[in-house]
Amino acid sequence: MSTAEAVMTTQDVANRFNELAQTGQWEQIQNELYEDNAVSIEPAHSQGLQTVEGMEAIRQKGKQFGEMVEEMHGGYSNEPIVAGNHFSLAMGMDVTMKGMSRMTMDEIAVYEVKDGKIVKEQFFY
């Protein structure tokens, strides 16, 4: 067992998430930090995006969002705040959605970590 990889703590996962988010490496975040059966929860008032389970569905949801974007002008994510097995951060983007004018979108994202992997993400906007 001495060759086994150490399980990342919630702080480790949050730090790595933030490191990758700063350079827009969202696919790498999903590939590296998410559990295969992770759940992604959108608010009830979300237009078009739904709550899904499993990485294939989460990737498809990301692709669906990308197809709604006409032009991405910029984005940000703040330093994560860790409490127990959860971390949260504020994220946002300056974006033009297809058929709409340029806008700023801001949200709070909360992530649950179990055994070194993200098992749930929930968005508030």
Where are these regions (language model features)?
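Short beta-strand segments enriched in hydrophobic/aromatic residues
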Residues: 34, 93-95, 109, 125
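A short hydrophobic beta-strand element
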Residues: 83-93
